[in-house]
Amino acid sequence: MNPSVPKVMKRENNTHLLVSKEMNDTSLQLPSTTRSLSPKESNSNEDFNVDGNETTLQRISKDYLKPNIGLVLLTVSYFFNSAMVVSTKVLENDPDDIANDRQIKPLQILLVRMVITYIGTLIYMYINKSTISDVPFGKPEVRKWLVLRGCTGFFGVFGMYYSLMYLTISDAVLITFLAPSLTIFLSWVILRERFTKVEALGSLISLLGVVLIVRPSFLFGTPELTDSSSQIVESSDPKSRLIATLVGLWGVLGMSCVYIIIRYIGKRAHAIMSVSYFSLITAIVSFIGINTIPSMKFQIPHSKKQWILFGNLGVSGFIFQLLLTMGIQRERAGRGSLMTYTQLLYAVFWDVALYKHWPNIWSWIGMIIIISATLWVIRIRAANNETTAKDLTPIIDDEENSIPLTEFDLSDSK
């Protein structure tokens, strides 16, 4: 008999013993692993999760949040916009500052807000430099469009800030609801999109709503003088209200141009880059205006409340612009424009919460007219887009899918 055979058999027996021991150890651990599982959990692999809530959250995120992420971003952005608007209203209409000739003007508010916002954009861009290209000025081929976005953005925000001096928060915000109709008109002029009679009629009806907000004296007569507390909420002077409304309409034009430019740029520039140009250009223009316009005086905040309000302007403005740009880039124009109506809910809330002021009957009628006309136009336009082959391709993330503005002589130089 070969003497090596017992050694082999012994080695195999030892190996068998080791394997058996490991299996026994594993089997001893199995009850502790499965003991916490309920019958429902053990019979359903789909619903099983250690936390118990993750699957539900993932399903909600997949079915509702992700498909509508653009709408969510826009809704949240408009909340921060409302916080910024109400801070502006309080700063511009402080009765003590008005009585002592220390009223803070819109350009000063814009300067402070945009300086804070621009600093925030620089910090954000350099922290995320690995994911944001060409910091801090963006790609050379889109810089001229970013500059144009900043210039038109200034007119848009100045129109709103000026109108807040003489109109209620809800009235000033309501005027901006003309932006969707004006955007459609500008799309016809610049992008050569269709502009139907229905859309033209809807725009005219919206203007009727604006007239009810302005309430000119030749139509509504001279209003009775009200107490000083009411004057803080809104002016009773028809001339002041008319000028404020016209400046607000000029701001609406700027907003519409911003929307088209951002849609053209698409994702060729990071959202924060658009905010950066907007804040920088607005700060520069505001600084020049304060130092060249004789009636402008730079007022240093003299109370804790004013410092807090100025700080809120900068922080809320930064978040608003960032989320707004991200939302516009991710959502179709029709659905995205519907979210602007959340601003009205916020505005009425602030008017009531801060000033105990409900809109009067004419403002309510104007509100209903403007909203109804705009919704009507958007609905008709959406229906037409479904039946025509001339739709714009949604912007994804490259230059090929951008709206071809260049063929309309808007980019002469490079």
UniProtKB/Swiss-Prot annotation:
Glycyl lysine isopeptide (Lys-Gly) (interchain with G-Cter in ubiquitin) crosslink, residue number(s): K40
Polar residues composition bias: residue spans: 25-51
All copies of domain EamA, residue ranges: 78-215, 253-379
Record carries keyword Transmembrane: yes
Residue intervals passing through the bilayer: 67-87, 107-127, 145-167, 172-191, 200-220, 242-262, 270-290, 308-328, 358-378
Top-level lineage group: Eukaryota
Region (Disordered): 20-51
Membrane topology, from the record: Multi-pass membrane protein
Coiled-coil region: none
SUPFAM superfamilies for this protein: Multidrug resistance efflux transporter EmrE
Repeat listed as a keyword: yes
Entry keywords, A to Z: Isopeptide bond, Membrane, Repeat, Transmembrane, Transmembrane helix, Ubl conjugation
GO cellular component, one term: cytoplasm
Lumenal face residues: 1-66, 128-144, 192-199, 263-269, 329-357
Ranges of the Cytoplasmic topological domain: 88-106, 168-171, 221-241, 291-307, 379-414
Coarse class of the protein's main subcellular location: membrane
Subcellular localization(s) per the UniProt record: Membrane
Family classification: To yeast YPL264c.
PANTHER family: ACYL-MALONYL CONDENSING ENZYME-RELATED (PTHR22911), SOLUTE CARRIER FAMILY 35 MEMBER G1 (PTHR22911:SF6)
Name used for this protein in its record: Uncharacterized membrane protein YMR253C
